[in-house]
Swiss-Prot record:
Keyword Repeat: yes
Transit peptide residue numbers: 1-21
This protein's name: Acyl-coenzyme A thioesterase 9, mitochondrial
Gene of this entry: Acot9
Lineage per the UniProt record: Eukaryota, Metazoa, Chordata, Craniata, Vertebrata
Known partners and oligomeric status: Interacts with NYAP1, NYAP2 and MYO16.
EC annotation from Swiss-Prot or TrEMBL: 3.1.2.-, 3.1.2.2
């Protein structure tokens, strides 16, 4: 068994060599970016999985042999720098018509759902580069996305005919978790790459069988800029803990929030009846229950990740597309995505599962639409449904949208939760209309 494991850990000749060609500065530089197709290829190479579904069981059995190579403590692992995990990836939409067809919409815009898939794959590869052992090929770690903390759109001018570039690196490290900062740029007519979005993902390392936690290499900042990034990672962790502690699933709304719900309730009472039971909808308003859209997908092997679970990027794409359709149907015009935040991957989705998505508008303000998507799965053999994800998307419409009114206490909690996510959004941006981002 051990000999077989050593055979699997042969010297690596084909993997990325991180740290080479980087120069310290406000942004790291590399000699040659990866093509977007190489990202998944590198992940398969690092994990050592088969590209053929029928061989997946054998490939996973081989990974069991790597369990003995996991470190017993983080102290035995060499510290890494942010430059060690830095990667640039090119999405050549301008020069590859076949690839462009995968990303273009009927309105000649870019499918943001595809961008979410690319960000998820890039985040995992960045973490493998942080933990890469130069003398080995296959990694004993199983690195998975646990949280999409925030994706902020800083420019909404994505053209399907101009190249896109992604960059990413590890910005904070705990014992078994890592925060990844990623940016996206697009080439413009001035031959310069302009920023499009900033993304923060949280990844966790697990053992070779993806059954328990595993230690990751510590991170050492090299300068003040990196120290600030690392401190921000600590603050993000504290913020997430505080947000979870104050969840409406755990504690009652604040007094201010209770007043908001009561005012909404009073606004919907019929003045003719003077009764708590008679409800009417105010002008230019919509009941929350009337904004729902649902979808069902069968999770085929084609959508699996390198660990033979359903690819997290696929789940995000399907959720986003349903959310966009919900916002479009509600607002009456094509919406623009502004922010994606707080996507927690609570449970893995197995191949063969039935994926149920339910989307609804839960909060609106002026031109903004806050959409929540609930994801749950069931197996073909069981009727039991389990929640896997809750997605939060903030959209902006070209025109002012109707107000949302809840009817029940449960819907009132969804309203307050949506309001909280909306308020956590960065400063509202002015959206450009030349190439809006669509699914």
């Amino acid at each position: 068994m051990k000999r077989a494991a050593i055979r699997l850990w042969t010297l690596n000749k084909g993997l990325l060599t991180h740290g080479r060609g980087l120069s310290q500065g406000s942004q790291y530089k590399i000699s040659e970016p990866l093509h977007i197709h190489q990202v998944r290829d590198k992940l398969r190479e690092i994990v050592g999985v088969s590209t053929v579904w029928r061989d997946h069981v054998k490939a996973m059995e081989e990974r069991k042999l790597l369990h003995s190579f996991l470190p017993k403590s983080q102290k035995v692992l060499p510290p890494r720098k942010m430059r060690d995990s830095y990667i640039e990836v090119l999405l050549p939409l301008g020069t590859d018509p076949e690839l462009r067809d995968k990303y273009v919409t009927v309105q000649n815009t870019v499918r943001f759902g595809r961008i979410l898939e690319d960000l998820d794959s890039l985040g995992v590869l960045v973490c493998y580069m942080h933990n890469h052992n130069h003398s080995t090929k296959m990694s004993p770690l199983s690195i998975v996305t646990v949280l999409v903390d925030k994706i902020d759109m800083c420019k909404h001018s994505l053209s399907p005919e101009q190249d896109i570039k992604f960059t990413g690196h590890v910005s904070w490290v705990g014992n078994t978790s890592m925060e990844v900062k990623m940016k996206m740029f697009q080439l413009h007519n001035d031959e310069k790459y302009w920023p499009v979005l900033d993304a923060t993902f949280v990844m966790v390392a697990r053992d070779s069988e993806n059954k328990g936690p595993a230690f990751v290499n510590p991170l050492i900042p090299e300068n003040k800029e990196e120290e600030e990034l690392f401190k921000q990672g600590e603050l993000n962790k504290s913020r997430r803990i505080a947000f979870s502690t104050s969840s409406l699933l755990k504690v009652a709304p604040s007094s201010e929030e209770r007043n908001i719900i009561h005012e909404l309730f009073l606004t919907t009472l019929d003045p003719k009846t003077i009764s708590f039971q008679s409800r009417i909808l105010p002008p230019k308003a919509v009941w929350m229950e009337d904004t729902k859209l649902k979808s069902l997908d069968i999770c085929h092997p084609q959508e699996r990740n390198v660990f033979n679970r359903i690819f997290g990027g696929f789940l995000m794409r399907k959720a986003y597309e349903l959310a966009w359709a919900t916002a479009c149907s509600f607002g009456g015009s094509r919406p623009y995505v502004v922010t994606v935040d707080d996507i927690m991957f609570q449970k893995p989705v197995e191949v063969g599962s039935l994926l149920f998505l339910s989307s609804q508008v839960c909060f609106t303000q002026d031109n903004y639409i806050q959409v929540r998507v609930h994801s749950e799965v069931s197996s073909l053999d069981s009727r039991e449904h389990m929640t896997t994800n809750v997605f939060h998307f903030t959209f902006m419409s070209e025109k002012e949208v109707p107000l949302i009114f809840p009817k029940t206490y449960g819907e009132s909690m969804l309203y307050l939760d949506g309001q909280r996510h909306f308020k956590s959004m960065s400063t509202p941006v002015t959206l450009k209309k030349d190439y809006p981002v669509e699914p």
